[in-house]
Structures are given as structure tokens and as C-alpha cells.
């Protein structure tokens, strides 16, 4: 079993506002373990808690999610890895490889309205690394629409749906190429797709990504940003050097 984590905090001051505590990366404490089953198979698990260091509250604003950073079990095989539970979302995880700030600070690439860092009730598959090429896929079960959400508004609107995603990533150390397509569960079948790449010359790395969002007004059983902003479709281009 491996115990891991990060503790990050700082003090910031903005003109016209009081001095306050903040962070560049969220603090976390996690537990990760594997058990060799022989013949190329292994069992695995992950539990990761996220917290706000300044007051000890749960990171993410939802006190009902104790293991915000991940809660899953899985099995590794010669044919790939299978995990079940709360896992990292493929489009966010892969696109982060193009961002030196890991999409987690003021200079990071902006998340779209239909991308999430983690997704629940999910079966995830990751292929073996084949000379730099990896393929991933997820299938997410929608929520139980019989009383598990606030007033069942999304169910009555017909916005409840299962979710799935596919990802292709190639990285040989110098060249990185990737593509994703994703539909979140309980999003009224909203979806995003993105393409990106990077090239490294010694210590210099240039990256570019394009993302297209089709937001139908729901985001994981909650009304999305497009409900209030009037923006249902958006495109995003990011470049980082």
C-alpha cells in the first residue's frame, strides 16, 4: 500500500479585498495498493481525499463526497486495466498532459461546461502501452432517478442518460497526440470532443488543443452553466509554450 498526497497553501491579497488563504493545487491524502495475483494479473484499489487546508473542509464544496479524488477497485491484466467506481475522466486526464499547470491554477486551460475531473458509477478500461499508444474507454451509469436527486427535475426533463467516453493518446516523449469524445451521465446527452498535440525540443515544449462543447443545459443531473449564461455550444482553443 502506498500513502501519497500533497499539502499546498499560501496567502493572497487583492486590491479592495481582505488578505486570505488560497492554494495553487488542492491538498490531498490518498491510499493506493496492488496485490500480485500471478500470471500477469493484479488486484488494485485507490482512495483519495481532497481538502481545503485553510479550514479543513472537504474540497469541491460537496461534504457528501469523502473521497473526492477517487474511490475505485480494479484488476490489471495482460490485456489492460479495468476499474470500477469513482475514477478520473478521460478527456480531462489526457488533455492535462498538454498543460504545464495541470489545469489546476490561474494559467491553466479552462475546463469546458461538460468536462469533469472525476466521474462516478463508472467502469473504466485502459489498454496497455503499445510503443507510446494507449486507448481508454469509460461507461458511466446514470443516477437512480427514483428520489436520489433533488425533486427529480432532470428525470422529468428527460435529461437522465448513461454516459460514455473514448480516448486515444500517443506519446513517444517528443511528440504527443491525443483525441477524446465524451458524453457525461445525466447531461441530457450533452457531449464534448477535443484534439491536441505537443512537440518538445529539449526543455521547450509547445502544445495546442482544440475543444468543442455541445451543452444541452444539464451537467451530471444539475443545471449547467448554459442554463444561466445562454451559451449552449462553445469552442475553445488553447496553446501553451
Where are these regions (language model features)?
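Outer membrane beta-barrel
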Residues: 1-13, 17-144, 169-176
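A short, polar/proline- and glycine-enriched secondary-structure boundary/capping micro-motif
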Residues: 93-97, 146-148, 188-191, 217-219
Amino acid at each position: 500500500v502506498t500513502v501519497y498526497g500533497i499539502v499546498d497553501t499560501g496567502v493572497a491579497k487583492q486590491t479592495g479585498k481582505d488578505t486570505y488563504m488560497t492554494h495553487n493545487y488542492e491538498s490531498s491524502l490518498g491510499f493506493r495498493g496492488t496485490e500480485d495475483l500471478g500470471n500477469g494479473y493484479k488486484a488494485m484499489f485507490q482512495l483519495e481525499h481532497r481538502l481545503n487546508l485553510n479550514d479543513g473542509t472537504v474540497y469541491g464544496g460537496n461534504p457528501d463526497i469523502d473521497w473526492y479524488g477517487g474511490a475505485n477497485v480494479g484488476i490489471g491484466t495482460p490485456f489492460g486495466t479495468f476499474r470500477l467506481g469513482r475514477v478520473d475522466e478521460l478527456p480531462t486526464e489526457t488533455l492535462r498532459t498538454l498543460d504545464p499547470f495541470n489545469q489546476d491554477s490561474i494559467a491553466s486551460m479552462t475546463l469546458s461546461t461538460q468536462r469533469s475531473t472525476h466521474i462516478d458509477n463508472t467502469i473504466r478500461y485502459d489498454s496497455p502501452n503499445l510503443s507510446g499508444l494507449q486507448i481508454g474507454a469509460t461507461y458511466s451509469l446514470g443516477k437512480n432517478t427514483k428520489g436520489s436527486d433533488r425533486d427529480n427535475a432532470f428525470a422529468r426533463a428527460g435529461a437522465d442518460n448513461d454516459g460514455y467516453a473514448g480516448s486515444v493518446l500517443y506519446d513517444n516523449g517528443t511528440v504527443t497526440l491525443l483525441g477524446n469524445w465524451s458524453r457525461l451521465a445525466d447531461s441530457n446527452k450533452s457531449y464534448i470532443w477535443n484534439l491536441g498535440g505537443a512537440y518538445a525540443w529539449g526543455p521547450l515544449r509547445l502544445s495546442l488543443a482544440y475543444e468543442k462543447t455541445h451543452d444541452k443545459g444539464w451537467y451530471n443531473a444539475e443545471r449547467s452553466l448554459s442554463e444561466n449564461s445562454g451559451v449552449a455550444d462553445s469552442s475553445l482553443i488553447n496553446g501553451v509554450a
